[in-house]
Amino acid sequence: LSPDYETKIKINKRELLDCIDRATLLVKEGDKKPIIMNVTDENMELKINSFIGSMNENIDIAKEGKDIMIGFNPKFFIDALRVIDDEEVTLYMVNPKAPCFIRDEEEKYIYLILPVNFNAATN
């Protein structure tokens, strides 16, 4: 894993997983709506807008580095988080167009999740 990340986030895995799970309730099968993560100092705002409705939730985090707004397919994030046993996960992000890495301190696992382009004006 390259040490060139711009943003490092420590977050409670269960809180993040539950929040993304709730967001997927607003997305129909085949609908490719991304979940938008807006990361600021002590907060990650997760939002999704779909034809069914919209959601906007906040989760407390510990962040090092720059603020970032990035979009992901919620299903890919859920798939990775479900197989991690740790209570806390660490996310490493470079920019909104580069992959996000999820890994533990001992590097027993590394998950790579590709971001999704989104129009910030509509989300």
Model-derived features: positions:
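DNA polymerase processivity clamps
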Residues: 4-123
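Active-site loop ensemble at the mouth of alpha/beta enzyme cores that anchors a bound cofactor
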Residues: 1
